[in-house]
């Protein structure tokens, strides 16, 4: 009887080891470039600011993520205030640890996310500083009613105070600017 019990224990251990080996082998076959899905949060250091609504984040595994700030649209670099709006975003986040709450992936493969720095909503701050429009076309999909109202209010205040892009009499929205330009790959 002792031999039978010992054999069962050995088989149980062998099967457990085999199961673990299969599990880890399956995990190791995931591509290194596997991207976080909608609803996930990426924490990491901002290693590059491309423009007023796009940055590159490096996570703790060393993987870089191209992030498009959700619910806003900043002037293109070729537009008036484009470089100033990029520089304002860089002042806030470059080489700092942030959290990116993923809401979508855009047609260029960038993760669309709400960026937080120490709990502060950086996307809304860009709007409040007059460095971006509240991108209402997409914001309704991602924002709660309270967030939507807060962004709309931030834009209205920036406009009334003539901050950033609102210094111009009639600033051209980036989506109008892009519509008039030849289609180019996004950063």
What is the role of each PLM region?
Residues 2-19, 23-187:
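Small beta-barrel nucleic-acid-binding modules, primarily SNase/OB-fold domains
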């Amino acid at each position: 009887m002792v031999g039978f019990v010992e054999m069962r224990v050995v088989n149980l251990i062998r099967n457990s080891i085999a199961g673990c080996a299969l599990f880890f082998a399956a995990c190791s076959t995931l591509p290194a470039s596997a991207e976080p899905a909608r609803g996930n949060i990426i924490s990491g250091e901002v290693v590059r600011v491309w423009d007023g609504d796009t940055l590159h984040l490096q996570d703790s595994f060393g993987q870089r993520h191209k992030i498009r700030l959700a619910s806003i649209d900043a002037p293109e670099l070729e537009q008036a205030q484009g470089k100033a709006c990029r520089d304002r975003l860089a002042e806030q986040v470059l080489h700092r640890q942030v959290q990116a709450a993923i809401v979508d992936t855009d047609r260029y493969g960038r993760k669309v996310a709400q960026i937080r720095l120490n709990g502060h909503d950086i996307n809304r701050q860009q709007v409040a500083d007059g460095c971006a429009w509240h991108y209402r076309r997409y914001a309704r999909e991602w924002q709660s009613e309270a967030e939507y109202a807060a962004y709309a209010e931030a834009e209205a205040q920036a406009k009334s105070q003539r901050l950033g892009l609102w210094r111009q009499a009639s600033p051209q929205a980036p989506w109008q600017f892009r519509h008039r330009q030849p289609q180019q790959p996004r950063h």
